Amino acid sequence: MATHKPINILEAFAAAPPPLDYVLPNMVAGTVGALVSPGGAGKSMLALLLAAQIAGGPVVLVGGVLPTGPVIYLPAEDPPTAIHHRLHALGAHLSAEERQAVADGLLIQPLIGSLPNIMAPEWFDGLKRAAEGRRLMVLDTLRRFHIEEENASGPM
């Protein structure tokens, strides 16, 4: 707890708080969110569309304009060819300038076959470093980023 500073309650009563920085509607910057649905529902494509939009691409999803910034997308389940298909489909709807903005702001690093494990210090630390300076980090899919039993409340 030495690195965590307590909130000065009297100061909080007196001073107006800074505005909240939302990465996505109702998702404050610096927090963790999850996109959950059955397999094959399109979560990976939705995550890629969100990543592209936040990386500087056009508004492609309901919710309007979102603050932009660098994004890292780490797919650990789909092979690079599947990601290429998704990017090709997305690119068909983008102008040359929009394609360049997405290419400049979005890093996609496929991890299929790497067996990432966020419970292992070297992976956890590596992911923390990869997230630094990024507006959004996508881990696709969480199940591929650990070896724990996902229905166990302790590790999860």
Label the predicted regions.
Residues 2-22:
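N-terminal pre-Walker A segment at the start of P-loop NTPase domains
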Residues 17-28, 60-61:
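Pre-Walker A adenine-sensing motif
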Residues 35:
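Hydrophobic anchor at the beta1->P-loop junction of P-loop NTPases
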Residues 42:
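Conserved glycine(s) of the Walker
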Residues 46, 50:
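Hydrophobic positions on the alpha1 helix immediately C-terminal to the Walker A/P-loop
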Residues 53-68:
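Post-Walker A helix-loop "phosphate-sensing" segment adjacent to the P-loop in P-loop NTPases
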